[in-house]
Each structure stands twice: as structure tokens, then as C-alpha cells.
């Protein structure tokens, strides 16, 4: 009996919400014009093997996974840290495997 009351209350709530005037007063034309005028806020991503020390979360995506900013100290005595966008090996192998599977069945 309790389940029936809960379901009935849920249905009444959904019906009253859907029949109300709506929360948003924007018309479809206004919404489309706002979407057309909105500029992209995403900054440009850093390509693979380029320096990402300025922003370690800016690496581009490959076909499936996002590259990772990897930092290391190069050989040669310079103690300056170098950071580049790279694809981890396990993700590289996963992409190759999925590409081969897609080529077999697709």
C-alpha cells in the first residue's frame, strides 16, 4: 500500500510540474540566438610532444584518450625540469587494439 502511495505522489508531482508554465521564460528563438552568440571558452590544447609546463592540464585528446603532461629531467647535467604532452603506453596499446578490432568487424 505504501508503494502505491509513493508512486501516486510521484506521478502527481510529475504531472503538475509538466503542466506548469515552466521555469524558463525564454522562447526558442531567443535561446537559439543566445547559443549562436556564445563564444567558445575553451582554450587551445597543447599538441603531443609539445611543452606543457605552463598548464599541465592542457594536453589534447587522441582518438580515444586524453594525453598526459609528463615531466622529467633530461640527461646532460641541466637540472631544469621539462614537461611534454605524451600518451601513456598502455593507452597507446589499447587504442591500437580497438582500431584493429574495428577494422576486423567494421
Swiss-Prot record:
Compartments, as annotated in UniProt: Secreted
Signal sequence segment: 1-20
InterPro entries in UniProt: Spider_toxin_CSTX_knottin, Spider_toxin_CSTX_Knottin_CS
Notes on the domains: The presence of a 'disulfide through disulfide knot' structurally defines this protein as a knottin.
Domain of life from the UniProt record: Eukaryota
Disulfide bond entries: 45-60, 52-69, 59-85, 71-83
Family matches, as PROSITE patterns: SPIDER_CSTX (PS60029)
Keywords, comma-separated and alphabetical: Disulfide bond, Knottin, Secreted, Signal, Toxin
A GO molecular-function descriptor: toxin activity
Tissue: Expressed by the venom gland.
Species of the source: Lycosa singoriensis
Pfam families hit by this protein: Toxin_35
Similarity remark: Belongs to the neurotoxin 19 (CSTX) family. 02 (D7) subfamily.
Propeptide: 21-41
Main localisation: secreted
Protein name: Toxin-like structure LSTX-D6
A GO cellular component annotation in the UniProt record: extracellular region
Amino acid at each position: 500500500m505504501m508503494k502505491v502511495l509513493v508512486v501516486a505522489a510521484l506521478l502527481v508531482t510529475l504531472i503538475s510540474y509538466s503542466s506548469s508554465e515552466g521555469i524558463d521564460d525564454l522562447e526558442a528563438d531567443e535561446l537559439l540566438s543566445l547559443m549562436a552568440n556564445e563564444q567558445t571558452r575553451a582554450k587551445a590544447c597543447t599538441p603531443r610532444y609539445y611543452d606543457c609546463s605552463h598548464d599541465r592540464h592542457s594536453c589534447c585528446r587522441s582518438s580515444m584518450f586524453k594525453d598526459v603532461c609528463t615531466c622529467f629531467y633530461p640527461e646532460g647535467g641541466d637540472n631544469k625540469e621539462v614537461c611534454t604532452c605524451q600518451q601513456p603506453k598502455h593507452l597507446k596499446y589499447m587504442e591500437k587494439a580497438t582500431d584493429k578490432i574495428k577494422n576486423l568487424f567494421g
